[in-house]
Amino acid sequence: MPLTTDTKKVMFEIYRDADYGGRYRVVYFTELGEHDKETEIENAMRGEHIFDGFLLHRERNQAKQVVDEILDRLNRGENVDENAIRESLQRYLA
């Protein structure tokens, strides 16, 4: 049975980069191309895990905006814990 838009998911991880001054970053694993897949996965694996999950495919653009806002807050030094991230993304999580 083919996947419908409602069952597709985007796997992602928010992490603190081990390089580049410890900035918080996100990687959307299921959207990586072959040319950047290995590098992006290695960067995430070296970093400090903050949050991961699956976003609903149909809501991915709105969810990415929320993720960007979370990253901005983290990179400004705000304390945003896992529960706050989950709450912010709740309506977009699969």
Model-derived segments and spans:
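Short N-terminal "domain-start" leader segments
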Residues: 1-46
